[in-house]
Design a protein with these regions (language model features):
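Active-site cofactor/substrate anionic-group-binding motifs, chiefly glycine-
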Residues: 77
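Active-site capping/gating regions of soluble enzymes
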Residues: 2-63, 67-69, 85-105, 110-113, ...
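Cap/lid and interdomain-hinge subdomains that line or gate substrate/regulatory clefts
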Residues: 123-159, 165, 169
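Flexible glycine-/small-residue-enriched beta->alpha junction loops
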Residues: 99-138
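Short, well-ordered beta-to-alpha junction loops that form the rim of enzyme active sites
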Residues: 180-182
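Conserved, mostly hydrophobic/aromatic
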Residues: 80, 178, 259
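Short, conserved phosphate-binding/catalytic loop or strand-edge motifs used
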Residues: 172-176
Length: 418
């Protein structure tokens, strides 16, 4: 029987493999409120390389958390942002694959392949009524060719990666996500429909898809953009997915995936409204927010924990250019707002926590400070055992913050009636 992901799934990241139990505790709390959300632990190849962790460690930590909390529902391990070059080491430990074809978006496929694909979907040419979208979609052969030129090559690559994994691990043994979010502008409903048709033609049993949304999804901070426009795009995407599932025989549980979804408080209510209205499912990835709760918990514990949290910031500040470079498109740091490390050295635990904890209404909250630390996990990785020992020493404080952050600020506003 094929592996089918549940309606609501929640991507969690545990960079240093110490917070699995605390993360799962938040999911358990949601279950106690009658909301079934399943955890998906995800860690990219880049994160493994930065930290120096073994790929198997993600599965080991997830399984240990599940055993410790006696969790008897599903859980998954996501090989996040994989491509053909790096997939092999993930094959033994993953049952969810986020196929990243960003590099192929915008690269035209062969003209003959584009024409053959467009010829295979004549039903999309003309005026198309999609239930849930106010206006009919107007599509011409020319507009479909244009979309195919931009995305078909990427979908073909996704098909190649999917078939490689299926050949190695067996069909139906894993969840497939196709990531289309790393492109310049959001896909329009006609574009998303063409992409989904192409995915169906490739025979990819896609269960989650990550389109590009309007606005900025910066790391660890709130959504920046037009919330009303986001809500319209989100609802339109849900409508297109429902239509494509029926039209092209895609998996019935196909749902949207929101990347960099942690801390996007402004859009949680619009997402919840849309899910309630349509009955749709959701996958949301919240990887990096937990590492910041480790720093908050360490600082809150005071003493050595606070000293170490200050040291992490001082190192991140000194190496900010190198740390920020790989994340340049998904951070927005005002260097004038970054406090001098000497100033931070004199802070109390409360001052450090207030600057870092994501409470946008708190007068001491510092978005730039938070974003720099978000991308600065490499500084903690370089500390090696010293950092890991601090996680153990400050476990009570850290666990409490990790669970509270995921439950109160993420799961509750997204899935639980207030």
């Amino acid at each position: 029987m094929a592996l089918i992901i549940e309606k609501f799934s929640f991507g969690v990241g545990d960079r240093f493999a110490h917070q699995g139990k605390a993360q799962l505790a938040a999911i358990v709390k949601a279950a106690e409120q009658g909301v079934e959300v399943v955890p998906v632990w995800n860690k990219s190849n880049r994160e493994h390389q930065t930290i120096g962790s073994e790929i198997a460690s993600c599965r080991q930590a997830a399984d240990a958390a599940v055993k410790a909390l006696d969790w008897n529902k599903s859980h998954y391990v996501d090989a996040y942002h994989i491509n053909l070059k790096i997939v092999d080491p993930f094959l033994d430990n993953s049952d969810f694959y986020t196929i990243d074809v960003a590099d192929a978006i915008g690269t035209p496929a062969e003209e003959s392949e584009v024409n053959a694909f467009v010829d295979s979907i004549p039903e999309l040419i003309g005026s198309l009524d999609i239930p849930g979208i106010d206006q009919p979609l107007e599509m011409t052969r020319e507009s479909i060719v244009k979309t195919a030129n931009h995305y078909l090559k990427a979908v073909q690559l996704a098909g190649e990666i999917y078939r490689y994994i299926a050949d190695k691990n067996g069909e139906g043994t894993f969840i497939t996500e196709v990531s289309m979010d790393e492109t310049d502008s959001p896909q329009t409903p006609p574009e998303l429909l063409v992409i989904l048709a192409a995915i169906a033609k490739q025979g990819i049993p896609v269960q989650t898809i990550a389109p590009k949304f309007t606005g900025r999804f910066n790391k660890g901070v709130d959504y920046v953009g037009d919330v009303a426009q986001f809500e319209k795009e989100f609802q339109d995407d849900l409508a297109v997915i429902a239509f494509a599932v029926k039209k092209y025989g895609l998996p019935e549980n196909l749902k949207l995936s929101v990347h960099s979804g942690s801390d996007k408080f402004s859009i949680y209510e619009p997402i919840r409204r849309a899910l309630k209205k349509t009955g749709a499912g959701l996958h949301i990835k919240t990887a990096g927010t937990t590492w910041l709760e480790e720093l908050i918990g360490s600082a809150e514990a005071g003493g050595d924990g606070l000293d170490l949290a200050k040291e992490v910031y001082a190192e991140a500040f000194a190496n900010s250019e190198a740390l920020c470079a790989p994340y340049a498109t998904v951070i927005d740091i005002n260097t004038d707002d970054l406090p001098d490390p000497e100033t931070v050295k004199a802070w109390t635990a409360e001052q450090y926590v207030n600057a870092l904890r994501h409470d946008p209404n708190h007068p001491e909250f510092n978005s730039s400070f938070r974003q720099l630390l978000h991308v600065g996990y490499k500084t903690a990785a370089k500390m090696g055992d010293r950092y890991l020992k601090m996680l153990v020493k400050c476990e009570e404080s850290i666990s409490r913050n990790v669970t509270e952050n995921l439950y109160e600020r993420h799961l509750k506003p997204l899935f639980i009636d207030q």
